[in-house]
Amino acid sequence: MLLPDWLNALILGLVEGLTEFLPVSSTGHLILVGELLKFNDDRGKLFEVVIQSGAILAVCWEYRRKLVELLFGLGHSRQARRFVLNLIIAFLPAGIVGFLAGKAIKAHLFNSTTVTTTFILGGLIILWVERRQRPPRVESIDDVDWRLALKLGLFQTLAMIPGTSRSGATIIGGLLLGLSRRAATEFSFFLAIPTLFIATAYDLYKTGGILHAEDLSAFGIGFAAAFVSAFLAVRGLLRYIGGHDFTAFAWYRIAFGLVVLSTAHYGLVAWTG
């Protein structure tokens, strides 16, 4: 499907923003939509890096007051220092695994079998977790200690497997560890900031030479679309979990996994990295 670059940018920006912070795997959706739009060459891969920056900025904007409090509280607030330290601890496992094995994971696991399996298995795990859900022991992200942060970071490493979903791994991991839905979701949002920022900066460093002046307008549209849609998705998810569980996302993952299986079987989408 050949569309103008600005329209490709708008569509992919919306897809990135709407899926980045939901437990559904933005990567899987971007592969599918990028393939359908025929926007999956090196420019397309660079574009994914740019729109991810828009999604990161959206969650920073949503929590701007908390981030400012943390920044100015580091010098005198023990709670601020503890929270930032917990984010660093939670980031380290994925950072180390990504540095040591990121290329190997992309080379060997980025295929339709892996993506299908992780989508469907992830959905089944969410259903299981929600059915066994017990009263939470941790109601606020400020009550997360370094041990919990480390365990949440270990859950985040699972997102290195294509189709798993970084948000899904950390949110469901949080529920298993006794966090409330809101605490698990908000910690996942905050953990996304250093994780996605560093990953995006690294990818941009590797691919930045491909960016040309004629791409700037389309990339700007995609960035803006990702920012707005991610902001709405974050706000919407926080409202949604106030009265619902994650079961709907589980069934969506299972259905999408079947879509991946079908498109791969009939050769409609090249599910490779």
Curated annotation (Swiss-Prot):
Transmembrane segments: 46-63, 83-103, 109-129, 184-204, 218-238, 249-269
Annotated keywords: Antibiotic resistance, Cell inner membrane, Cell membrane, Cell shape, Cell wall biogenesis/degradation, Hydrolase, Membrane, Peptidoglycan synthesis, Transmembrane, Transmembrane helix
Gene Ontology MF term list: undecaprenyl-diphosphatase activity
Family annotation (Pfam families): BacA (PF02673)
Enzyme Commission number(s): 3.6.1.27
Uppermost EC category: hydrolase
Subcellular location: Cell inner membrane
Chief location of this protein within or outside the cell: membrane
GO biological process assignments: cell wall organization; peptidoglycan biosynthetic process; regulation of cell shape; response to antibiotic
Stated role: Catalyzes the dephosphorylation of undecaprenyl diphosphate (UPP). Confers resistance to bacitracin.
Additional free-text comment from the UniProt record: Bacitracin is thought to be involved in the inhibition of peptidoglycan synthesis by sequestering undecaprenyl diphosphate, thereby reducing the pool of lipid carrier available.
HAMAP family: Undec_diphosphatase (MF_01006)
Identification of the protein by name: Undecaprenyl-diphosphatase
UniProt organism field: Methylococcus capsulatus (strain ATCC 33009 / NCIMB 11132 / Bath)
Record gene name: uppP
